[in-house]
Amino acid sequence: MSIQNNRLLVLASALALSPAGHAATFCATSTAELQNALDTAAVNGENDVVRVAVGTYPAPVGGPFDFDQLAPVNGDGLSLTLSGGWTAFFGNPCGFRSEAYNSFDTILDGEDRERVLRIIPDGAPDIVIEGITFFRGNPSEGGTRRGGGLEIRSANFTGKLRVERSAFLFNTADYGSALEAGGSLIRLRNNLFVGNDAVNSGVIEAVIGNGDSGIYLTANTIINNATQSSAASAQGGVYIFLWTDTNALLVNNVIQGNDVTDLKLSGEGNVTLRNNLIDVRVGSITTETGQITGDPMFVGGLLNFTDFTPDVGSPLIDTGIKPPALIPFPPPFDSNWGLPDYDLLGRPRTQGVTVDVGAYEALPVDVFSDGFE
């Protein structure tokens, strides 16, 4: 569930959300089961839902977890939802998932020997990833390596991608150390990117091609990502390329402490920033409102890599914005965004006056915690 935009035309909304066809559902409790589910999902002629039970899953020997709709002769080009956080219920090992799941409970581990997950879509499927931690991805193939945690190869992909309430920790690649993404519309919301290391450049690399719609980055925490390169173009932060007439909307993000540049924008598209804390930016910004500055003041110490909750006094607390409640149809690009109901640790998304900035929601301060009333 998520904080949804309430569209004025209910019928149009219902049509937009109606499924393309029957969905096949899989449950994975081991590396082999997960890869088998992805193999079947690529060719079975159905939209597919792959549920991953809570646990840690090493990447297969000799390659990443792989969803490839081009290699099989009969790849179906239909949609995939991959979600973590599932637990046993009445004999089904993937029978239940709380809406308040913890995104660090389901880990796909590249073990520093393989990319974690590669998705090669064909045509215009919807690709959705929820509640997965991508850990220690390191692609083993030769040539230019992209997307150490997750690679969405986009040459034949004209569908939509959504990555939500997921984490990318300690991945590496030449470009896009954590994520390489493409598609007609990309939504990255309420994710953590920390400790990833690019041989050349970028923790996230997203290219929005000619004729595509754009990219939404909403409520992400993207910090302390590195580059090994000393080249003038190298940087450890987010890289977005926009063709003419494409769009990027960045709302409620923390992008800070990344090597050289936190956000690098290229191309000729339209870029809107709202209520972000972004330190070092390069490139043209069309519109910016609600800029936040200063030390984000996270609760964790130097060895913390999973909890970046804003501490008391943080400029991130109650400085985010919510999606518009009413928008016209068809919705303008800058209004057509949303937020999950829960943060990365499974806490309700709004604790105070409004949402906090970043992937974590601070809990209310107990003014009587010292024992005096």
Task: Label each region the model flagged.
Residues 2-9:
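Bacterial N-terminal signal peptides that target proteins for export
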Residues 29-36, 47-80, 85-93:
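N-terminal extracellular ligand-recognition/capping segment immediately after the signal peptide
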Residues 123-201:
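Right-handed parallel beta-helix
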Residues 63-69, 77-79, 97-99, 152, ...:
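Predominantly extracellular beta-rich ligand-binding scaffolds that present long acidic/polar faces
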Residues 59-60, 85, 90, 111, ...:
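Surface-exposed loop/turn segments connecting beta-strands in extracellular beta-rich domains
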Residues 18-21:
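N-terminal signal peptide c-region/cleavage motif recognized by signal peptidases
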